[in-house]
From Swiss-Prot:
Family note: Belongs to the shikimate kinase family.
Protein name (Swiss-Prot/TrEMBL): Shikimate kinase
GO CC annotation terms, alphabetical: cytosol
One BP term from GO: amino acid biosynthetic process
Involved pathway(s): Metabolic intermediate biosynthesis; chorismate biosynthesis; chorismate from D-erythrose 4-phosphate and phosphoenolpyruvate: step 5/7
This protein's UniProt keywords: Amino-acid biosynthesis, Aromatic amino acid biosynthesis, ATP-binding, Cytoplasm, Kinase, Magnesium, Metal-binding, Nucleotide-binding, Transferase
Binding site for ATP: A26, S27, G28, K29, S30, S31, R132
Amino acid sequence: MNESPAPHPLKQRLGGRNLYLVGMMASGKSSTGRPLAEQLSYGFVDTDAVIEQLAGQPIPKIFSEEGEAGFRTMESQVLNAIGQRHSLVVATGGGIVSKPENWGVLHQGIVIWLNPGREELLRRLNADSGNRPLLQTEDPEAAFDCLFAERLPLYCEADLHVEVGAEEPDGIALKIIEFLPQLLSPPPQMNG
């Protein structure tokens, strides 16, 4: 009989608080979230995947039919539902930080900003341009720069800023685990 691995020592210190991964599109939130959740014995949720499942259509189609405002409303509803649960790593959509009311839910957990930097993000986005509704313009790079400038001060509100390069998602997850204790109160000392 296979025994499940012992939970990570941080799990108890986290006290069930959700970890919310934020960052620009293509910053690696989903790919990093899965191994991070596995390492911590947490569940994993991708808000974009939940929205697609509930709407029964892909995000680009939601944007074309409902507009960005309609999508952001759905995103906030999904975030509110997720916020009722605990012990989750949550990969959020890149613009989730743009609605002030979302921060009430985000701040109930720990907010982690994944920042690969502009050049790496543009490289990743060029490889995946068809699935990014906000970049379907004459000048996608200018649209990206505008979005990034608008969101940067909001991403800076995160509890933990993680600079990422070309590391594998497992390595980024380990980096997050390495930095998390700095955000948590020290474990209680046993007198004896």
